[in-house]
Amino acid sequence: MRILAIGAHPDDIEIACSGTLAKCVQRGDTVIVCHVSSGNLGHVIIPPDELRVIRANEAKKAGAMAGIEVVWGGFDDLEIYDNNREARDKLVDVIRYANPDLIITHDPDDYMPDHTAVAKLVFDASFTATLPNYKCTSRRLAKDDTPAKLTPIYYMDTLAGVNFNPTMYVDVSDTIDLKLQMLECHESQVVWMRDHDGIDFPDMVKTCSRYRGYQCGAEYAEGFRQCQVYLKGTTKRLLP
């Protein structure tokens, strides 16, 4: 299988579903992660232009740990809007490049505007990318306008699981250590979350995985729910 995980910022995927993606790589899947935004505003002290470079390096390091390809959506923080063609076409390009069998992204009811905008853009772009006669106006990755497949969408957990009720779980007990190592590659964000949100970032993520584990009889787990609309459903179990 080819799996595309699309997160708003570098580290969103590591927080919500990197344990699952690591298991996908281990079973032989090709996994591509797209960070839609550069993450350039995620620090109290480091200026945006400098932070953009730091976070790109952190994301590449994290992806390499699990054998995951990392690509970028071409936005900066809080500049992701879900109501214009340019934004949608940037994700059409990513989806046509990846040609996935499954897309994982943010829940539409997540906590901040970049996350909810990405959820809407992925929903729109995943259909648009399948149209043979649709000409993408923002092609950086895909070689041409070859359409992508119709693809199920799974929504990953929200931060701290707020307002999210999983309909499926993945046991990540054997990849939780790798998940935390990938997360800790994002050193700038460990500091940011402590200073801005007042939390111990790795501890929060581990605790949330333990909580989902309690819900499904595993030591650690990640939760997902499927996008239930026409052409997005499937009877198959696609996750490990």
List each model region and its residues:
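Active-site rim/loop-helix segments in enzyme catalytic domains that contact anionic ligands
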Residues: 1-98, 225, 236-237
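Metal-dependent de-N-acetylase/amidase catalytic core
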Residues: 1-4, 82-240
